[in-house]
Amino acid sequence: MKFQSFIKFFAIILLMQGAAFSADDEHDHDHSAHSDEPFYGHVGIRLHLDHVNDAGESDEEVNELYTHSHIELGSRIAEGLNIDTNLKIEGEPGGHNHGGVSRTHDGDDRIFEDHPLIVESLTLTYSHEDFSAYIGKFNPKVGLDYHSFPGLWSYSMIEEYKIAERIGAGLKYGTNLDDFGTHQLNISAFHVDTTFLSDALLDSRGHTSKEDGGLGNTEDFDSYAISLGGKDFYSLNNNIAERVSYRFGYAHQEAGTAESDEERYSASIV
């Protein structure tokens, strides 16, 4: 039954992809770019088929079919007011536990095994001119996101360092400096999601509570992040400048149970 449900959901993703929700390389994944549209979306699909023919343990020599895909949907519900969500199916090869689900090898082929369906973000955003304020569940902006890294397995690098699925609020301010690019400052305060949205469908991962501990799991808005990013530079003499983007970020996560506070920094130019 679970496999059938997964196939149905994946079929919906494919239909939406064919219905032109997908984006080309120039798509702007900042939903504020669509804030005047009544309905908008984006589909990202990764389908992996791995064959392991030589491993340290014989039960790891298997075939694996899995997907790491997402649907971003949004709607303008009033003047300057938008609601956005990101639904993600987080499949991984055996031995990985991204998404809060442990995946192990037992010698059998793994066909769409251990695929939690996650509400990774659900936000309400108010925008006025260059300012935006948002509240809900989101991934605090610190470093580069999925769409900035090339390669088939680039998403796994992001999973290792990103701060994800936090409850809180934030502010954004953007400015356009013409030939000197567009820039955006993003500031947010948050804590780990301990609501019903912390569980998953298809493959449950359980409900997160404060007692589980971990960074930012305080149920207070005492963790925070700040970042500055820019792109869209222009030069008559240098085509490289037009392709350059940057992001600098900092985050502080307050200690949960049996943890210490964490400070993290990010600097990138691509």
PLM feature spans:
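Outer-membrane beta-barrel proteins
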Residues: 52-58, 94-98, 142-147, 194-200, ...
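Outer membrane beta-barrel
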Residues: 62-195
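Short glycine/proline- and aromatic-enriched beta-strand/turn motifs that initiate or cap beta-hairpins
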Residues: 24-70, 221
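Detector for outer-membrane/organellar transmembrane beta-barrel domains
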Residues: 219-270
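Solvent-exposed loop/turn segments connecting transmembrane beta-strands
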Residues: 58-63, 90-91, 163, 179, ...
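Transmembrane beta-barrel strands of outer-membrane/channel proteins
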Residues: 43-51, 85-89, 135-137, 185-191, ...
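Short loop/turn motifs that connect adjacent beta-strands in outer-membrane beta-barrel proteins
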Residues: 23-41, 73-83, 127-130, 176-186, ...
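Bacterial N-terminal signal peptides
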Residues: 8-17
